[in-house]
Amino acid sequence: MRGLDYRWIEALDSVVSKGSFERAAEQLFISQSAVSQRIKQLEKYLAQPVLIREQPPRPTLVGKKLLGLYRRVCLIEQELVPELTNQEHVRPVSMSIATNADSLATWLLPALDKVMKSRQVELNLVIYGESRTLDKLKNGEVVGAISLEPQPITGCSAEYLGQMEYLCVASPEFYQKYFAKGVTPRSLIKAPAVSYDQYDELHNKFLWDYFAVPRDKVINHTVGSSEAFVRLALSGAAYCLIPRLQIISELESGALINMTPDFMLSYPIFWHHWQLETGVLLEISEAITAYAKSVLPQ
């Protein structure tokens, strides 16, 4: 019986990553019908569909598992072939990491700095909410993910990194305008705030846990940028929950005020990665865990 042909999975990967059969054919230098035939052969071999044929095409659950396998094999091949063939000029090892925006804005880039400068690596840092990054690892879309979840998924390990501490801050002018009589449920309802996106529950959790303010009572802008949070707070347009690590100098200079010094939101974050790591992926995991533990409260 014929085994699994990786050209079939390669075709699936191209269709999913490029978003169409036509662009996948261009990438693989074969006809569009040949791409379709390879995926049909894969589905016949597995006796189940691997692709949801809509625009853009999406992998089924089985398809996602196959893509995870394929990308692992590609990563191992990228690292192993130059070693076996003594090739000096090869393409960098390509890998994707899922991270939340706040980690990227504070400690993640310094953690990766040495590896990016010393190794032939092409990193794709994709941003998702902390509760969603692990889904990307499950689907095989990334080789590692920063997540709130302490439990590793099958075939992966989870390393504790530290605590992300969030302070509720505003400019002195904003504070005087909305909170001159104190930070109370009434004043919090009147003042405009900021959240990252529709999945961001951080602000709502803070207001409910400490002030019993329900989410439907809050004026809440949505801005998909951690750096923009700081700019909005500094401009006096809103108050925000911002990582302490991101605004140390602003707090020291008085440009921002910690509105609730008695209350702080803190939660643990974890680095999830494949168990069987080698080469540059192992170096990345070691760099992330070591640096995070040196700058994040433990």
Swiss-Prot record:
InterPro entries: ArgP (IPR017685), ArgP_gammaproteobact (IPR023490), LTTR (IPR050176), LysR_subst-bd (IPR005119), Tscrpt_reg_HTH_LysR (IPR000847), WH-like_DNA-bd_sf (IPR036388), WH_DNA-bd_sf (IPR036390). Keywords: DNA-binding, Transcription, Transcription regulation. GO terms for molecular function: DNA binding; DNA-binding transcription factor activity. Residues 21-40 bind DNA. Residues 4-60 form the HTH lysR-type domain. GO terms for biological process: regulation of DNA-templated transcription. PANTHER family: HTH-TYPE TRANSCRIPTIONAL REGULATOR ARGP, TRANSCRIPTIONAL REGULATOR. Controls the transcription of genes involved in arginine and lysine metabolism. Homodimer. Belongs to the LysR transcriptional regulatory family. This is HTH-type transcriptional regulator ArgP.
